[in-house]
From Swiss-Prot:
Coiled coil: none annotated. It catalyses: guanosine(527) in 16S rRNA + S-adenosyl-L-methionine = N(7)-methylguanosine(527) in 16S rRNA + S-adenosyl-L-homocysteine. It comes from the Bacteria. Specifically methylates the N7 position of guanine in position 527 of 16S rRNA. Belongs to the methyltransferase superfamily. RNA methyltransferase RsmG family. It is found in: Cytoplasm. S-adenosyl-L-methionine binds at G76, L81, V127, E128, R142. GO terms for cellular component: cytosol. InterPro entries: rRNA_ssu_MeTfrase_G, SAM-dependent_MTases_sf. GO terms for molecular function: rRNA (guanine-N7-)-methyltransferase activity. It is an enzyme of class 2 (transferase). This is Ribosomal RNA small subunit methyltransferase G.
Amino acid sequence: MNPLRVKLDALISKTSLTVTEQQREQLVGYVQLLDKWNKAYNLTSVRDPMEMLVKHILDSLVVSPHLVGERFIDVGSGPGLPGIPLAIMHPDKEFVLIDSLGKRIRFLKQVIHDLKINNVLPVQSRVEEFDPESGFDGVLSRAFASMTDMVNWCQHLPKPNAGVFLALKGVRPDDEITLLPEWCSVTDIKALQVPELEGERHLVILSRKG
């Protein structure tokens, strides 16, 4: 068996996630494509595919149980994190992956084609200039910006009254929380357990007040 698949299976076994055979193969395929493209396009500072499984794949997958709704947007998606792993985990949900760099969008289109992922739309745009036809249940960000910048730049993206912001962070970002704009409030903070990852991970869930 592919060593990446062996490692992925071992990591998943340390979580409570349910991941099908097809999803596991797609996740491994994604890492292989990321590794291949990374050599030419410098999409991530993580060079070792085994390390990518922990720092990129599992770090994204642990958000999976906290997705409520049908439509999500991953802002500043980069090479598709956390959007691609989450889209693989949730084929019944729609994901828009937005990034301003053309090389990243080209990579995402290749991933979608090669892995036959049909619930992802890659968009090349600055997030503050993106004008969707309708709002999203969740606005995801990972290593994108401060939470204040994120909610200010993305405040037009969540569904009115129902949509939330989902910010994936390291240590609990209490300093950032104190700087949030008046209209925004923290509704929950989830401590995330990522197998074999050093350091803390937290998911901060935010929404518009009222």
